[in-house]
Amino acid sequence: MMPDQPATACPLVLASASPRRAALLAQIGVIPALTLATDIDETPLKGEVPLKGEVPRLLSRRLAQGKADTAIRVLREQSDAPLAAPFILAADTVVAVGRRALPKAETEAEARQCLTLLSGRRHHVWTTVVVIAPDGKRAERIVESAVTFNRMTDLQQEAYIASGEWRGKAGGYAIQGLAAAYIRFLSGSYSNVVGLPLFETAQLLRGLGFRSL
């Protein structure tokens, strides 16, 4: 009798080194066979700033598509690639206040700037998910959530900055962590704000024939 095949053995490549996205996929029983760190230029292009609300959507879409294309190229270049024809999943999350896309905070100064802009305001989080099937078919979805921060005092901001939780996070905060104490309202997908909208991701995978969901 063959041993039970674990639900985690999935022919899927995650084009992201984000532990948050890997953890979210695991939540719905999907653990990638391979993860790839896809380093691409995340600088907004001139054509991505035409209309209010369009900036972060276009930026998120371009970056997610770029990550997917990079993953394809890397897999083709690796002669010893462990998977001949996997599904590829790429995603990119952009946090924006109005037309202004916030950075992935890497310094305390960037984190402080983000928190100052977010404090007492509503902002939007866009994640584009791109899935490529083994036969080359593509599907994508852009998901939007709205988040409202309570007004943070200077002392609260400094305490959060001291935690270091913001480092590498889009918009300089993690809703699944200490920042939850300052989230007054959320409209839309919670997992989208963490980094991967699970319902929409599962729909994309199912639609392209991913059999583990």
Swiss-Prot record:
Cross-referenced Pfam families: Maf (PF02545)
Which co-factors does it depend on? a divalent metal cation
Q: Where in the cell is it found?
A: Cytoplasm
Q: What is its EC number?
A: 3.6.1.9
Entry-linked Gene3D superfamilies:
3.90.950.10
Q: Which InterPro entries match?
A: ITPase-like_fam (IPR029001), Maf-like (IPR003697)
Q: Site (Important for substrate specificity): give the residues.
A: 20, 93, 176
Enzyme class, top EC level, equals hydrolase
The record's annotation in CDD domains points to:
Maf
**Cited function:** Nucleoside triphosphate pyrophosphatase that hydrolyzes dTTP and UTP. May have a dual role in cell division arrest and in preventing the incorporation of modified nucleotides into cellular nucleic acids.
Q: Which family does it belong to?
A: Belongs to the Maf family. YhdE subfamily.
What protein name does the entry list? dTTP/UTP pyrophosphatase
User: Which organism is the protein's source?
Assistant: Granulibacter bethesdensis (strain ATCC BAA-1260 / CGDNIH1)
